[in-house]
Amino acid sequence: MAGQQFQYDDSGNTFFYFLTSFVGLIVIPATYYLWPRDQNAEQIRLKNIRKVYGRCMWYRLRLLKPQPNIIPTVKKIVLLAGWALFLFLAYKVSKTDREYQEYNPYEVLNLDPGATVAEIKKQYRLLSLKYHPDKGGDEVMFMRIAKAYAALTDEESRKNWEEFGNPDGPQATSFGIALPAWIVDQKNSILVLLVYGLAFMVILPVVVGSWWYRSIRYSGDQILIRTTQIYTYFVYKTRNMDMKRLIMVLAGASEFDPQYNKDATSRPTDNILIPQLIREIGSINLKKNEPPLTCPYSLKARVLLLSHLARMKIPETLEEDQQFMLKKCPALLQEMVNVICQLIVMARNREEREFRAPTLASLENCMKLSQMAVQGLQQFKSPLLQLPHIEEDNLRRVSNHKKYKIKTIQDLVSLKESDRHTLLHFLEDEKYEEVMAVLGSFPYVTMDIKSQVLDDEDSNNITVGSLVTVLVKLTRQTMAEVFEKEQSICAAEEQPAEDGQGETNKNRTKGGWQQKSKGPKKTAKSKKKKPLKKKPTPVLLPQSKQQKQKQANGVVGNEAAVKEDEEEVSDKGSDSEEEETNRDSQSEKDDGSDRDSDREQDEKQNKDDEAEWQELQQSIQRKERALLETKSKITHPVYSLYFPEEKQEWWWLYIADRKEQTLISMPYHVCTLKDTEEVELKFPAPGKPGNYQYTVFLRSDSYMGLDQIKPLKLEVHEAKPVPENHPQWDTAIEGDEDQEDSEGFEDSFEEEEEEEEDDD
């Protein structure tokens, strides 16, 4: 058996393979993730949306932000140097000699495989004359030629070559280790051990420990754990939080505390500027002593948020702090929504009366505060202030107009172009076009709702205690798209009909957001009563004439009766025959109708089965898509005049009972709605049968006044009784019966054998 030898690389050839692979594993992923993206694409995108978003704060900050030219250049230089090193090593590896080469005697003698013995001898003579040492040839080459000649002519050498790959028989196998020899040299052992100890015992633990202690302070949504604890405590303490209390709790987040977040700053000038803003804002509940809500950082964050909602001008030194605080608000409010939902679930699972769940109003106030923070508006301000060039002074002209009383954005969109231009006459043409462009970019989302019980035979039958699944299909369009469709419909209806009916333009369809016009009320005077038609009264005859008429009628009636009896006797035979034929035809018709009804029932059942199968396949595909797909959270940019960061349109979808003010299903944060999105909301059915009225809410986290509400009716039935006898449960009994039958058969067979033996 061949021996084995392990040797370190003295020449460095094997080490180049290892080094090339190592550099390639670093350079290729680093190029994919760290290569600077094209800056021109972002500039082109900003240029295309300038008409709509040009006045937004985040857009102006993006343009004013200095372009980081040095960092992309440094990244490119480092990556190009890495690729140069990788290519150099690859070239070096391609030029190095192979460590292991298969021995081929034909190649040594410069012959083709399969040459004859005569050709081998002839070639050997020529090469031996050329490389013989006595004639000044190469001794090493001559030895190789002699060895190759022996491998092809000597039977034993040829056999060794065919079996072991070498004419001399099995050789020792050497394995090269891809490390240079100086690493294992005894002279360098102390230095190598020092480097290994420094790398694995000092640097690696420090890096891993610092990363661990830094990441353990944050949750999965990059929110400080301490912030979540603060929100949980105050939400549990205050069951019903109004907007003022909610702002206080929001400002108490540790993200605004310089002790826990290095990005949060505290300046000496805050002691002068913050009290000035407090005097301008008014009362902000400074008397309560509730740390950390009364800490300086929390007070500063609260004042900056209130000044933002009031659209107040603040000193330049506080603008940067305000922008930092506003960027954190959407994520913090989402965390507060999660905390409220967790407390509601805990209250449902516990039967303790002392543990009270937060109210639905607290949850909805969190969502409203997110809209307010993004748009920079107070709670009861008009949603029209989200539009450009519409201020408090201009708003009065719009909302208090004699003819058009516009309160919401939908009311403004539903107007005709001429009426809208008349209403906004105080705007110049350029400003009016900008307002219309912004108004057309606002989202309009429709909801299609379907409730069912999945994994059940009758999915449409909702029973007590079942898990109800409400499938909501969201379709997003812009206000401009919907309005253009309605304008085209109205224009088509206004055209005169060809048949001359000119009243078709009276019944015009209106959009989903348009208010239904109430017709004129009918007064009592306008109602005209139709005259009642009088029935003709019969003419009364004298009594003597009536008796004579009755007698005459009686005589005539007797004669007619006799004639009718004779006709009946003559027609009895023909009537009986007709009745028999009618019975036969009627029975045939009944049989045909029964077959048709059975066929229709079978077709209907097959269609129902196909529909159920398709729904099942669609639900399976939907679940697989939800598990495998990773949709981007970049949907559509939000138009916000005073928000410092580009924000995407996200929504909250949930089901609630408005009458009982309870939350039915947990809010689902829709972050991937670009055009259409399907969302499943699941909740347990009520414990008692009956009809229930719920409401499906779709709330934006960025826009005010664009929430959608749709009713949901549920008819809950009694739960089906558990079947006591089922065919699947009879398998054990059938098995016992089969076993008894087999045993009886064996007993009878044994008795027959015994009788035959007795006869013998």
Curated annotation (Swiss-Prot):
The protein's name: Translocation protein SEC63 homolog
GO cellular component, one term: endoplasmic reticulum
Species of the source: Homo sapiens
Cited Pfam families: DnaJ, Sec63
SEC63 domain span: 197-541, 637-714
Disulfide bond entries: none
Location(s), subcellular: Endoplasmic reticulum membrane
Record PTM Phosphoserine, positions in chain: S742, S748
